[in-house]
A protein has these predicted regions:
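Patatin-like phospholipase
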Residues: 1-40, 48-269
């Protein structure tokens, strides 16, 4: 029997929609035998919380409400050492605390996280120093800190300062492919991601357009190469950086994600 895995894409604030869709998958018992996880950016946060026993609807409690993000549009020269104006660590204290409380280890390494949970966890990030994609995991990078890897995976250029790990600078894994299926090709995989990209208006949207096209094409190619993938796609009414939403708005978007599960309306008819 093949191993079961879950792949969750990135998406910034749109991850709330993914949580809703993932909740329906979880509620149907489809994730019961999953022991391998792969996540990018917001998807890495979702996977980490799920691994320690926090289901998708419970994860809404840990979704950050951020009203003070600053942007630097010149930061799309992404190979400069300091791009972005915010340290991502500032916004993840609640997330880090719950992980530490659940496994009883402060600032765990990837090896310690695996030993505490028994789950293999791949976290994608782009190494801009060496110009390559990295899939952090407990076998290849046992001594890397879990939170460093997750922060690196979500360090969106223009928003967050790149994360330094062992002398290299890392940015959001989505700048290569926001749907990290590559480590899972030999497993029976459930994948949760967004469908076609939505292009935003304005200068910031135009600057993201090429990146979004690349990410979409890379995702489609990764899907083609995976021999045993059960794919769930959705759309979101949120934008990538809509991180200042109220609790009611988050819940509405969560339910929007739930309704996109193929069986949702059949069950609730």
């Amino acid at each position: 029997m093949e191993e079961r895995s879950l792949c969750v894409s990135g998406g910034g604030a749109k991850a709330v929609t993914l949580l809703g869709l993932l909740y329906e998958i979880h509620a149907r018992g489809q994730l019961d035998k999953v022991n391998i996880f792969s996540g990018c950016s917001a998807g890495a946060f979702i996977c980490a919380l799920y691994i320690v026993g926090i289901n998708p609807i419970q994860q809404l409690k840990y979704f950050p409400q951020i009203t003070d993000l600053k942007f630097d549009l010149s930061a799309f020269q992404i190979f400069i050492e300091k791009v972005g104006m915010n340290r991502i660590q500032k916004y993840t204290k609640k997330f880090r605390q719950v992980i530490e409380d659940k496994i009883g280890i402060q600032d765990p390494t990837l090896k310690e996280f695996y030993e505490a949970t028994g789950k293999t966890f791949y976290i994608s990030a782009v190494n801009t120093t060496k110009c390559k994609i990295i899939y952090f995991n407990h076998k290849d990078y046992p001594d890397i800190k879990l939170f460093d890897a997750i922060h690196a995976s979500a360090a969106l250029p223009g928003v967050f300062i790149p994360v330094k790990i062992k002398g290299s600078s890392f940015i959001d894994g989505g700048y290569y492919n926001s749907f990290p299926l590559e480590p899972l090709v030999d497993t029976d995989t459930i994948g949760v991601c967004f469908s076609k990209p939505v292009f935003d208006d304005g200068l910031f949207g135009e600057m993201l357009k090429i990146a979004k096209l690349h990410i979409y094409i890379a995702k489609k190619e990764a899907i083609k190469r995976h021999p045993n993938l059960e794919l769930y796609e959705c759309t979101s009414t949120f934008g990538l950086l809509d991180l200042d939403k109220t609790k009611m708005e988050l819940l509405d978007e969560f339910n929007h994600g739930r309704q996109q599960h193929p069986q949702y309306y059949k069950q609730n008819a």
